[in-house]
Amino acid sequence: MAGRVDGVNFAHSTHWEGVIQQADDTYAYYGFKRGRQFIAEATLLHEIQDDKYDFLISSNCLEHLANPLKALCEWRRVIAEEGVAVVVVPSKLATFDHKRPTTEICHLLNDFEKDVGEGDMTHLSEILSLHDRSRDRQAGSFEEFKLRCMENRSNRFMHHHVFDMSLLRDAVTLCGFQVLAEHEAVGNLFVLARKRSEVPLNAAINRGQN
């Protein structure tokens, strides 16, 4: 049983949670227990010190990020040595992304090298063309969906990238984790991984620059 669980969200108000207050006792979990609620980008957890947590859980977040490798490296930073992470992303075949191509790891590496920010709209054209609105009850008409996408910086509905298990495994491994277990269920991909001392991503970037 965890002594304390804290939470992070990207804004003070979201479509999914409503109004969120950053404070020491506003993150509710396991009934009446309370932890600290942080408001921060997944790629910039500047209020959280290194090696702070024994475990980290990310569920259906990574696909919404323009720079997933940057986020994974930041998550690794705040996990203690030998700590673990559980990362969950949707399987593309179970979502409105099923018509889109699976993202390649070289694309994620390129985003990391360029330090792509969360306002990036590189994938907008692909999303407008291939997003299956029949599987997205909140998409509305094409024009309504397009407007929602254009406002992604504030609403974060958009799936920037499309994962399969191979991509998720490679991304987690590159960012300094050892994959301990993989599982697919209920339309989601699950990876359990332990923090390693080495970060292969750094070596990959260095090789690309030489």
Stretches with model-predicted labels:
Residues L44, E63, A94:
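Active-site micro-motifs of SAM-dependent methyltransferase domains
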Residues D54-A66:
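A short SAM/SAH-binding and catalytic strip from SAM-dependent methyltransferases
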Residues G35, S58-C61, M158:
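Short, flexible active-site loop motifs that bind/organize anionic cofactors or intermediates
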Residues M1-L45:
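Class I SAM-dependent methyltransferase SAM/SAH-binding core
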Residues Y29-F32, L69-E74, V84-R207:
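S-adenosyl-L-methionine-dependent methyltransferase catalytic module, highlighting the catalytic core
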Residues L65-A66, I79-E81:
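Helix-to-beta-strand junctions that scaffold the AdoMet/dcAdoMet cofactor pocket
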Residues A40-L56:
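A short acidic, Gly/Pro-enriched loop at the edge of an enzyme's catalytic core
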Residues K52, E82-G83:
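Surface-exposed loop/turn positions
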